[in-house]
């Protein structure tokens, strides 16, 4: 996936990180898994959103990418 395929909010933050206005996190995969896990565990969110977050987190964990 390319940045231009992402929503406006993602593209805006990408630009801010690239310009130094927003902090860069070197362990991006760990950050993503933690965030997806938090979303999956949040019972105030719709089950469909939680399921999607859990699926994405599980796929990242099983992938061969490492921080």
Curated annotation (Swiss-Prot):
<dbReference type="Pfam" id="PF06786">
    <property type="entry name" value="UPF0253"/>
</dbReference>
<protein>
    <recommendedName>
        <fullName>UPF0253 protein VS_2370</fullName>
    </recommendedName>
</protein>
<dbReference type="InterPro" id="IPR009624">
    <property type="entry name" value="UPF0253"/>
</dbReference>
<comment type="similarity">
    <text>Belongs to the UPF0253 family.</text>
</comment>
């Amino acid at each position: 996936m390319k940045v231009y395929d992402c929503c406006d909010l993602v593209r805006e933050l990408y630009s801010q990180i690239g310009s130094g206005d927003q902090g860069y996190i070197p362990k991006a995969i760990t950050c993503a898994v933690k965030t997806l896990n938090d979303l999956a565990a949040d019972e105030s969110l719709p089950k469909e959103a939680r399921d999607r977050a859990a699926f994405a987190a599980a796929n990242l964990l099983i992938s061969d990418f490492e921080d």
